[in-house]
Amino acid sequence: MLIELQDLGKSFGEHEVLKHVTASVERGDRIGIIGANGTGKTTLLRVLCGESLPDAGDAAFAAGATCGYLEQTGHLDPEKDVYETMRLAFQPALDAMAELETLQKQLAADHHNTAITDKITACNAVIDAMDAYNMDTQIKKVLNGMSFPADTWKKKAGVLSGGEQTRLRLARLLLERPDILILDEPTNHLDLETMDWLETYLKAYRGAVLVVSHDRYFLDSVCTRIWELRGKTITTYRGNYSAYLPQREAADERLQKQHDADVEKAAKLQDYIDRNLVRASTTKMAQSRRKQLEKLEITEAPQAEAHQLNFRFEYDIEPYDELVIMKGLTIRIGERTLLEALDYVVHRGDKLIIAGPNGTGKSTLLQVLDGKRRPSGGMVRLG
C-alpha cells in the first residue's frame, strides 16, 4: 500500500472541501480522478503528495515512497537548456557518481577501510536504481517521445513557450520515476502523437499513477480505476472511464431509491405523530415514533450534474454564409514556411478542428485569422 486515506477531511475556513474520504493507492494502480470544477480535485492532489495536511482523518504513506506532482503551473530554471533540465532528474545519481570518484581515490590509499567500501556500495545502489550509466539514452528517449527534437535540446528553458515548458516539466518528472506519479491535466499542450506516446509510457509505469483529466479517451486508455469526487467525497469505480459510466448510473439509481424510501418513511412517521400525539390512548406510541424519526438518517440523493447552458442570440440582419475567406494564404516564420498558398472558406455552421504536431503552426494560424499577426502572403478576409 503506497497511500491510505481514512475518513479524511479538508476545509478552508468554514468552507468544507473534502469529508469522509476513504481510499487507497497501491503500486501499479492507474487512477483517474474526475469531478466537476470546484469539487476539490487539486486540493486532493496536494494532500496525496504531502503538500497539504488533512484537517480530519488520516493520510498514511508507505515508508520511503517518493512522490512526483505535475501541477498545471510550475517553474523551470530559465538559464538551463532543455537537455540540462532533463539531467536534473538524475541529480541523486550524479551526486553519487561524484562522491564515488572521491571514495575510490580514498580507498586506493586505504584498502581495508570498511566505512569507505560501505559508502561505495551505497553510491552504486543509487546509480543502479536510476540506471544512471544509461541516462543519456533515457533522456533522449523521453525527449523524443515528448516532441522535443534534437535541434531544441540546447534551447534555454526561459525561451520556451508556456506549453513547451509544461511538456518539459512532465518529461523531467517521468524520468525521475517516483513511486507515486500525480498529474494534473497532463494532456494539455500535447499533440496526438505525443499523447499516444504518453499513454503507452504510463501503461507500463511500475509505480502508481494518479491523474486528473477531462479527456475521457485518455482516461479510457490509461486508467484501471476511477475516483469520482462528488458531494465532497470519493467514490471508487473499477475499470476505465467507459466502465465507470454504467456503474455510476446504477449506483445513483440505488441511492435515489433509498433516498425516496427514507423520505417516505419519514413522512409516514411524521403523519402518525401528528395524528396521535395529542390523544391520550396513543401518546406513548406517538412518542416512540418521534424517537424513530429523530434517529432516521435520510440517505442523500445523488447530486445531479450541472446542466449545459444554451444561448440563442437574435439578430436583425442575416449573417454572411462565408465567414472567413482565405486566398493564397502563406505563413512564414523566418525562413520556415508553416503554410503555403492556402485557399479555404469557413462557412456559417462549420465546426472545425485544427490538428497537427506541436510546432507546425496551429496557434500561428489562429493569430493570423484573428488579425494579431500579418500573413506572409495571400489574404484573409472576414465575411
Name each region found by the language model.
Residues 1-259, 307-383:
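ABC ATP-binding cassette signature C-motif
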Residues 247-296, 300-302:
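Intracellular alpha-helical coupling/juxtamembrane segments of multi-pass membrane proteins
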